[in-house]
C-alpha cells in the first residue's frame, strides 16, 4: 500500500519506521498530467516489491516537505535508505522507476 504523507513529521516518521528497507517517494501534484499517468504504475509496484516502502507526497499539500527535499518539478521520485537519500530522478519514466527500485533495494 502506498502511504500518503500529509506533514513533515509524518515524512520523517515514515523514513525512520522503514529501518533498513528502501523507501520510494513519489512527489506529485493533482494538476500534473504525467503524475496522473504514472500513478497507477507506482501503486502497482507496491504489490510487486513488498520489501519496499512506498510514499506519496502531494507538493501542494506538503510544500514544506517538497521544499526540504528540493523538489523542483513533478513527478520526482526519491529513494531513501536508513533515512538518507540514495537516488532521485524526475519524469514519468516507468522503466527507470522500476530499474531504480531494483538497483537500490
From Swiss-Prot:
GO terms for molecular function: protein homodimerization activity; protein-disulfide reductase [NAD(P)H] activity; protein-disulfide reductase activity. Disulfide bonds join 32-35. The active site is at 32 (nucleophile), 35 (nucleophile). GO terms for biological process: cell redox homeostasis; cellular detoxification of hydrogen peroxide; negative regulation of protein export from nucleus; negative regulation of transcription by RNA polymerase II; positive regulation of DNA binding; positive regulation of phosphatidylinositol 3-kinase/protein kinase B signal transduction; response to nitric oxide; response to radiation. The modification N6-succinyllysine is found at residues 8, 94. The modification S-nitrosocysteine is found at residues 62, 69, 73. Residues 2-105 form the Thioredoxin domain. The record marks 33-34 as: Contributes to redox potential value. SUPFAM superfamilies: Thioredoxin-like (SSF52833). The modification N6-acetyllysine is found at residues 3, 39, 94. The record marks 26 as: Deprotonates C-terminal active site Cys. InterPro entries: Thioredoxin, Thioredoxin-like_sf, Thioredoxin_CS, Thioredoxin_domain. GO terms for cellular component: cytoplasm; cytosol; extracellular region; mitochondrion; nucleoplasm; nucleus. It is found in: Nucleus; Cytoplasm; Secreted. In the fully reduced protein, both Cys-69 and Cys-73 are nitrosylated in response to nitric oxide (NO). When two disulfide bonds are present in the protein, only Cys-73 is nitrosylated. Cys-73 can serve as donor for nitrosylation of target proteins. Homodimer; disulfide-linked. Interacts with TXNIP through the redox-active site. Interacts with MAP3K5 and CASP3. Interacts with APEX1; the interaction stimulates the FOS/JUN AP-1 DNA-binding activity in a redox-dependent manner. Belongs to the thioredoxin family. Participates in various redox reactions through the reversible oxidation of its active center dithiol to a disulfide and catalyzes dithiol-disulfide exchange reactions. Plays a role in the reversible S-nitrosylation of cysteine residues in target proteins, and thereby contributes to the response to intracellular nitric oxide. Nitrosylates the active site Cys of CASP3 in response to nitric oxide (NO), and thereby inhibits caspase-3 activity. ADF augments the expression of the interleukin-2 receptor TAC (IL2R/P55). This is Thioredoxin. It comes from Mus musculus (Mouse).
